């Protein structure tokens, strides 16, 4: 099993890929022996306010996984948020028997939380990340980064 993490922008600039994020992600699995592709998606509203989400593709199932992005994150320091995403996604895959939905949830939550922490090393525990995921999935008025 191989996992490839690459943003849409990086795929276009580095690998000269064309098309939308779904076409690009799928093309990697057609070109290389890759089972999973994850692509983060950050929207910068201002230097200190971002939204963050991702798309996760399972080549064996030929299925894309997405969730509502974390919106209007008050960014303290974004350095390390990509590494935080990868650590969360890998945890979700390994802990939950290669469940792509869980990989997406843990990756997105871990990265979103990291954006609110100074320094390049996230200091969040598993309980905090799981609480963030639960809050993010709840309906109605919520504080997504309620820590």
Across the structure, where does each feature detected by a protein language model lie?
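A generic structural signal for short hydrophobic patches within well-formed alpha-helices
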Residues: 11-12, 129
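A short beta-strand/loop micro-motif in the catalytic core of glycosyltransferases
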Residues: 1-8
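Catalytic metal-binding/acid-base residues of hydrolase active sites
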Residues: 9-11, 43
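Conserved phosphate-binding/catalytic region of the ribokinase-like
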Residues: 18-147
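Alpha-helix N-cap/helix-start capping motif
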Residues: 8-9, 83
